[in-house]
Amino acid sequence: MKEQLRACILKGIEGCFADGTLTSGEVPAINVEKPAHAEHGDFATNVAMQMAKQQRKAPRAVAEILVAKLAGASDLIESLEIAGPGFINFFIKDGAWRRTLSEIDRAGDAWGKSGIGRGKKVQVEFVSANPTGPLHIGHGRGAATGDAVASLLSAAGFDVQREYYINDAGNQMNTLGLSGLLRYKELLGEKIEFPETCYQGDYMKDIARDAVTKYGDRFLKVSQEEGVAFFSKMGGDLILAGIDQDLQDFGVRFDHWFSEQSLFDEGKVNSAIEEMQAKGLIYEQEGALWFRTTDYGDDKDRVVVRSNGVTTYFASDIAYHRDKFARGFDWVIDVWGADHHGYVPRLKSVVQGLGRDASDLGIILVQLVSLLRDGVPVAMSTRSGEFVTLKEVVDEVGRDAARFFFLMRRSDSQLDFDLELAKRQSNDNPVYYVQYAHARIKSIFDTARERGVEPLFDSVKFELLQTPEDLSLIKKLSVYPEILEGGAVNFEPHRITYYLQELAGEFHSFYNKSRVITPEEPELTQARLFLLHCVAITLKNALTVLGISAPERM
């Protein structure tokens, strides 16, 4: 609807240029927004205020000229009014709103989708947890966010690839190997002083037990270096397989798993450093190599290779992002924990050093999750330092509830996740409230058929949908494509959870005030069934893009 209105306003402005009522000139970007109060119309624009200086007229005078041109010029517009310093308020005809229902029915599963990203290739890299332990709930929020952003971008027409970056080249892998070896020796009877720097979780004992079952005491007889290398590989593989399974159980599947170690094995770290040196962006000082990130607004230059010759994580990130763009992605999106916010300027510097625009790298920061039970905080970790895992949360509340709750707030704001609320089958539980709306509609259709009313949608009389509840529900349906597009380009899946709760609220309000199946008014019955058919399509599409099911019975 907004796009149609923008086109109408543009045509009106061009008409005023043509007839001389306005001086020809550049047309500003036409903003069309929904007013805060319904009495100010369905939409409003400030275009008259934007054009006033160019036209050398008062904003209200420009608005009067435009209103005169637009009045009666479109079958969208019922009436117009000028408000305040020069806003133009639009009241849309009921018939124009009702036409949305035919669009929804025709589009079906494609309702809401757009082609704004057509021809553009995007990579979303998310989770990317070290393969040194199971995923915790913070990773779960990152997984839900990254997966939903990828789905939103796909719905907006982008060609999207989901990628997991395996941090398998750092010192943490040696620590993992040592942890596994010590637990293995302990299990075979050796008295071990287990260092605090090693991984404390019980999963390390599981890895050791697996090694004993498969290999007996073989690794008691090898050097520590060989034992650490073995348990680093075995432990990493087992943990990564567990991570993959937990993510699949959570509804997340990656198109590509990328090993950090492969960057070293294939010489990509060295070649990336050499390229940046050739560009004058990496220099030597005190035996170390530094990247000139201050050239791009960072507060200080960053070390790439230490004076002892050991590369930093930053060196891997330079090579990794160089590799991403070399694979042909137009847009690269990283999903990080909020504790990495200080890392943003240096990565933006790398992207610019590669000759790309800083905006070609999108970074989504994901804040912490606090667990509650009926409003009371839950301990997030055990005495041994094990965090509550994603698997534990999904097993307790279910995949749908977990995903919805993780996506209920902006990713960069802290999230309270109430486990008891997430399990509650009541309207207090937002995911239940939304899913129940979909199931309730399916139940209404079952009831209609039981009463001998078969939905017949080939000649629906939409004009019978005229109550405030009818029209309010239709208006809420009509904004879904705009919500979806905004969620995609701004990386904000919480816009969809907000919208779903609002749409479910409109539906439940409609249902409580309106009779759907009215035997004495068969045409109105068919019109309202069609309206609910469109609500069900929209609920299902919006839930699906978040990776959440739309149950037909609850």
UniProtKB/Swiss-Prot annotation:
It comes from the Bacteria. Pfam families: Arg_tRNA_synt_N (PF03485), DALR_1 (PF05746), tRNA-synt_1d (PF00750). SMART domains: Arg_tRNA_synt_N, DALR_1. It is an enzyme of class 6 (ligase). The keyword Aminoacyl-tRNA synthetase applies. It is found in: Cytoplasm. One of its GO terms (molecular function) is arginine-tRNA ligase activity. The keyword Transmembrane does not apply. The gene is argS. HAMAP family: Arg_tRNA_synth. This is Arginine--tRNA ligase. PANTHER family: ARGININE--TRNA LIGASE, CYTOPLASMIC (PTHR11956:SF5), ARGINYL-TRNA SYNTHETASE (PTHR11956). It catalyses: tRNA(Arg) + L-arginine + ATP = L-arginyl-tRNA(Arg) + AMP + diphosphate. Keywords: Aminoacyl-tRNA synthetase, ATP-binding, Cytoplasm, Ligase, Nucleotide-binding, Protein biosynthesis.
